[in-house]
Amino acid sequence: MTVFRQENVDDYYDTGEELGSGKFAVVKKCREKSTGLQYAAKFIKKRRTKSSRRGVSREDIEREVSILKEIQHPNVITLHEVYENKTDVILILELVAGGELFDFLAEKESLTEEEATEFLKQILNGVYYLHSLQIAHFDLKPENIMLLDRNVPKPRIKIIDFGLAHKIDFGNEFKNIFGTPEFVAPEIVNYEPLGLEADMWSIGVITYILLSGASPFLGDTKQETLANVSAVNYEFEDEYFSNTSALAKDFIRRLLVKDPKKRMTIQDSLQHPWIKPKDTQQALSSAWSHPQFEK
């Protein structure tokens, strides 16, 4: 069992405002006393007993920490330190203070495909790095893509929250991971073996949302959403996509493929002509998209 720093985190950090929370985790802004530097402290509630359903299991916490310790990339969040007390494991993480990508885009009245691809290239670069290490994130969605600083012409993004991430070991199958219904791949819905391909599906959903503000598979209920995902039941509605380029739609179509083996890989995505145009004019001719963001 991995042992984390048992000292009192309050001796080393002043904690401030809450930045966000999940089922068993709370993230707060904090300041390191010795340096004055600001970080984000993620307090993960530990599961008391193996039979308990409250809190996060030791195995899951150690897996998240192990993955965070391994990664170092401009588009991925960085781990600073890990503390532990009787009730929580506390991850001291890089502070990503610019808010969610989704909220940033929701504030803009319109965005070009060129602007959307500026963000997507960063997401793809981050995922390329993770996949090169055989790490699947399994929870890619707009809420887990944060801006470092929203008040610059071309904001930099960071992929956050590795609570569901796994190392994909060949011969070692995962089936039981579950993220947010709108973004999960059909193989997750159908409890089939999972791999890096599941992230590529999620990138397809994110791309659809960035260009339209609409969610491709969202139904009135969780069950309806999952049924839509499993059946790959989506369309490019004229209301949202009448001015979207054929290349952008092709990019999405090649990701929202039911068979994981026929889906674009991260390498394919980076080489797709919408992301890597053969000539500049091809990129500049991309039409305006007018999103109507609905959370």
Please name every model-derived segment:
Residues V26-R48:
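Glycine-rich ATP phosphate-binding loop
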Residues G16-K23, V27:
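Protein kinase glycine-rich loop
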Residues V82:
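Activation-segment/catalytic-loop signature of the eukaryotic protein kinase fold
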Residues T87-E100:
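Conserved short submotifs of the Hanks-type protein kinase catalytic core
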Residues F119-L120:
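Activation segment signature within eukaryotic-like protein kinase domains
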Residues I44-I71:
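Conserved N-lobe beta3->alphaC-helix segment of eukaryotic protein kinase catalytic domains
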